[in-house]
Amino acid sequence: MIQQIKPSIRSKAISKISKATYGLLVGACCLLASYDTLAQTTSSSASLQQNQTPLKSFQGYYQLPNKVAFISFDEQDNSLYATQLWDQKKRYQLVRKDDTRFESKNEGYSIAFLKNSAGDFSQAKILGRIVCERVPFDPNKIASLTASQLKQLAGTYLMANDNNLKITIEPSAQGIILKQMWDNKTISFTPRSELFFLNEDGTFPLTFSVANGKVEQMTCFEKDLWLKAD
């Protein structure tokens, strides 16, 4: 004869089954919540990456305040790299911190890209204090200028804070020749752009400034200003 299960035993069995079922339900809910959180995190991360400024927007050449040194930025394998165009062209891989801020992977050097009023990236701030200007030329390559482009630079220049000091600029086959009138020393320069020149070893920069279609002044190095006299 089949024995009937006593009520107390039946109640305990139901209680155990209920607890087991509850545990399974809780586990399933936690698992689903984990998947949902992971999906949201992945979706948010993907959305953030899609909204980030493309690395190619930062590529180019940037000139340090001393006018002699340059840094280039280029994209490679979905990473941004910075290369010093001096000191044996040391190269740094950069790690993105947010949309426009990066750090060198091994050294932790900070780099922030800044926009101008037109919304274009025009500067790079190195180490939080050194502002480098983006330039539209490759400082390693000699530019080809016409005779008329070189001729507009020719003339006599007076030092801004001492008119007794004079230099002359004359066109040459390779670029221009600067002559110091106080000692007759001459230095040859080749163009990197229409208005930027370097001497043979790249340690002496000349930057010409134009206003109203005419060359009005020349800056040697960072702040050595000369005014065109003719």
Predicted regions mapped to residue ranges:
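Sec-dependent signal peptide recognition
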Residues: 19-25
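Peripheral terminal and inter-domain segments
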Residues: 40-230
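Secreted/luminal cysteine- and crosslink-motif detector
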Residues: 30-31, 133
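N-terminal secretory signal peptides that target proteins for export/translocation
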Residues: 1-18
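Cleavable N-terminal signal peptides
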Residues: 26-27, 37
